[in-house]
């Protein structure tokens, strides 16, 4: 569900069906293969114009969205401001860069006083852009967080699968200051740095996406919503600790027999972390905070391993279980040990909360694959 091969494009006939749900990543006619949306669950197509313009409505919250392929005569900013003028709403520029522009707007839409966010992202492969508008009525402003998440669901390139979305990048930008971090991994002291705002920015994303996740507590698509929750944290976290990940890899890889040996050093490191919850509303500790000695739980530790491995170009994912209230790290490896299959791959699983265990060893009572949900990563 999260690889290019599994990314799907809706046919025009399917898009005309109001019952059609947009799940996982979806792409568009007229844009490159790496341009996609990873929308929150239970958005469906209310109306469409051909295969390039769609009005979306959400089944679990009073939020609507428009996704439209647009030509870019000049910059994303110009295309976005032109769209706002046509919509006849008031707006203020929240931020722009060479790839995208973002505005916050308010005005009357469909006869209701409304508020929302709009962005245009540029597809470098075709020169076209995607206009993405997400809004709710002012009386439903408490759901505006879902509109933010819709904006952040847009990926304009393969690199965006590993980076903060447009909203987080432009509204919560990096600082100009970096802070030193140190970690003892595999007997070696790793010295690196992270942006000074990495922790606070990451925690904002985590808290927001947890609000999104709570919308699906009683939804039949709760598992898919859970998967997206972790995917959104993954893509944001990959960027926050990318330099640290690469410093770890390049300082350790020459001493490791293979990728599994490297991954074992990460697993042993996370097993020694202090246990703590409630770092954020969701109880998920941000990865930057963990580098400063903050406590963590199983899912944050599993995510830490997955992020470092993915940043090191090593195939990994995580498995989560509502039944066991637990999470496991997972690594694509031909080493012996207990593994779970996801898609067409077998993943060696790792227990992050019991010191001394190696990859492929978990509690016997937790080996039922049916009780685990895979979170596949790019």
Model feature map: region roles:
Residues 2-9:
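Bacterial N-terminal signal peptides that target proteins for export
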Residues 226-293, 353:
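Secondary-structure boundary elements
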Residues 256, 288, 300-378:
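Hydrophobic/aromatic-rich core segments of domains that either
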Residues 11-18:
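Bacterial N-terminal signal peptides
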Residues 43, 134-171:
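Surface-exposed amphipathic alpha-helical segments
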